[in-house]
Amino acid sequence: RIVLLASSSVKQPVANLHLSNGIRPGLVGFMKSMADEVSADGVTVNSILPGVILTDRITNNAKLAAKNQNITLEQRLDNMTATIPARRFGRPDEVAEAVAFLASEKASYITGATLQVDGGLIRSNF
């Protein structure tokens, strides 16, 4: 089993992440091509598209943005979650559970797929 950890930017560009917005869709395209080549051998190849997952990186970036915007960290975090239909950040363990599923025998007929773990952040139907 191969599971690529990509980004929601594959389907919906993220502001000011130009490099990520350009490169990650290409990696998922590569993943799809690999799935075509190795699936007959019983190898599955899938990718996870995490949304905004509450990690130290997100917290540190939010602190900097709050300072630059002259607002509290709590206000900045509230502003961020307001853009997510689930109205909360994802947790690292939620992404880990999705990876574990795709790496398991239960996902043996799933290949070439992208799984969004984003609380509804990605607005695309596809």
Model-derived segments and their meaning:
Residues 69-73, 84-95, 106:
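A conserved structural motif in NAD(P)-dependent oxidoreductases
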Residues 44-54, 103, 116-118:
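Conserved SDR Rossmann-fold cofactor-binding beta-strand/turn motif
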Residues 14-16, 58-60, 126:
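Conserved catalytic-core motifs of eukaryotic protein kinase domains, centered on the activation segment
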Residues 1-27, 31-40, 52-53:
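Catalytic loop of short-chain dehydrogenase/reductase
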Residues 49-60, 64-66:
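Short, flexible catalytic-loop segment of classical short-chain dehydrogenase/reductase
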